[in-house]
Amino acid sequence: MLVAMSMTPIAILFSTPLKRFLREKVLLGNAPSWELLAILSIYFVQGVLGLSRLAVSFFLKDELGLSPAAMGALIGLGAAPWILKPVLGLMSDTVPLFGYRRRSYLWLSGLMGSAGWLLFAAWVSSGTQAGLVLLFTSLSVAIGDVIVDSLVVERAQRESLAQVGSLQSLTWGAAAVGGIITAYASGALLEWFSTRTVFAITAIFPLLTVGAAFLISEVSTAEEEEKPQPKAQIKLVWQAVRQKTILLPTLFIFFWQATPSAESAFFYFTTNELGFEPKFLGRVRLVTSVAGLIGVGLYQRFLKTLPFRVIMGWSTVISSLLGLTTLILITHANRAMGIDDHWFSLGDSIILTVTGQIAFMPVLVLAARLCPPGIEATLFALLMSVMNLAGVLSFEVGSLLTHWLGVTETQFDNLALLVIITNLSTLLPLPFLGLLPAGDPQVKDKTEKEDNPDDPGDRLVLPPAEVFEHHTVGSLSDQNFLPEFFPEKSSSRP
């Protein structure tokens, strides 16, 4: 009786055999708590925000009349706030709002996000205005993302290496479930409502983040014994990024992410040339959301213990080669094989989503395992911002290639060449796989320290860590303040 009284309500719910099964299998061994529920809720909301993905794409294409190159450039610039994640992380670590470092920023994120979608619904009428609101909405999601990242990293620091991947797979799943719920609706709603109405509906969901923030377990800054100092944080981060175990993998990931994307051009091809309707594109989103879960499951079950170099090398090669299957659709070779455009696109999207998900999971694990305690939000945000910068470059370079090759709203003669260039370019970083650690960098650092206790060396002894970034191939992927650009830059699928 005393034991039951000492348990939290949510823990009691997981005390029966069935609930224990759900804890071990559904929560992947993570202990249930209100804070975990809040974290999963925030990622779930970010998945739900995919409701507006197709609406934004069609709004920019049809109502604002942007060209493929212009859309790509606008989307890339709209993602610029994600480059500021270190600043946002530093602010959350050192500058509390209303007495809190995490809750208050989640409140701000939710309110800004809702306001941004309302502006889309009622105000935006030009490319310039769209760019400004994209920046604003992007900033709102970036704020929430860096905060929830820090919460997950703080929890992950307490986990053993044996459980690496479990929490990030769980949060991946939460976002994917949100995406699945709204995937089909994202296209179906456009059959019934205008894009602006869809934006107004989307404005409701960021408010759920505001509610979830109240479940975060956080001590008020007024009760803190030690106050974080910005200068001290910056010094710690600078010391960390100078270590080869952090710097070299970051350089590789940057080069890997910065290869060009052809997604905007391919979106125009599927809608203007192939005649894909919003309803069908919603179905594609539905099956790819499920495929994303399959990719996470495969990584969690079979691949999470593979060395970084092995999984990154093979997944990059396989993703690049499979991405070339898009040429079959572009050249209409599938029709000669008796396969309808819709069915081929659907099957191709499933395969490419699974491989893309598997390719990016080890990047997230590696990034999080490089985060020392005390500066989790700031350093992880710095690593993600480098990836985001590479993602912006990827889209901007892709837009330039689209323009140079003369791919427009109706001219797709050079689209096949564009897809070949973007896919094969993903192989360019492979000669630099040696920049990645051969094994777990934390284990290696610890071993070296034990062998040379008096030698400070140039490495940090880092604690176990893992984290979720709800991105697939491309650091900006699946950011649902915009169309899902970047997730398929190697595949260039819709």
Curated annotation (Swiss-Prot):
Record note on what altering residue 309 to C does: Affects 5-formyltetrahydrofolate transporter activity
A Pfam short name: BT1
Localization, UniProt: Cell membrane
Documented effect of changing residue 267 to C: Affects 5-formyltetrahydrofolate transporter activity
Membrane topology designation: Multi-pass membrane protein
Region spans: Disordered: 441-461
Mutagenesis / variant outcome for changing residue 369 to C: Affects 5-formyltetrahydrofolate transporter activity
Effect of residue 93 to C: Affects 5-formyltetrahydrofolate transporter activity
Reported impact of residue 384 to C: Affects 5-formyltetrahydrofolate transporter activity
Transmembrane segments: 31-51, 64-84, 104-124, 133-153, 170-190, 197-217, 246-266, 284-303, 310-330, 346-366, 375-395, 415-435
Single GO molecular function: methotrexate transmembrane transporter activity
Outcome when changing residue 259 to C: Affects 5-formyltetrahydrofolate transporter activity
Swiss-Prot/TrEMBL keywords: Cell membrane, Membrane, Transmembrane, Transmembrane helix, Transport
GO cellular component: plasma membrane
CDD domains the record matches: MFS_FBT (cd17484)
GO biological process: 5-formyltetrahydrofolate transport; folic acid transport; methotrexate transport
Matches recorded under SUPFAM superfamilies: MFS general substrate transporter (SSF103473)
PANTHER family: FOLATE-BIOPTERIN TRANSPORTER 1, CHLOROPLASTIC (PTHR31585:SF0)
Similarity remark: Belongs to the major facilitator superfamily. Folate-biopterin transporter (TC 2.A.71) family.
Role: Mediates folate monoglutamate transport involved in tetrahydrofolate biosynthesis. It also mediates transport of antifolates, such as methotrexate and aminopterin.
Name of the protein in question: Folate-biopterin transporter
Species the sequence originates in: Synechocystis sp. (strain ATCC 27184 / PCC 6803 / Kazusa)
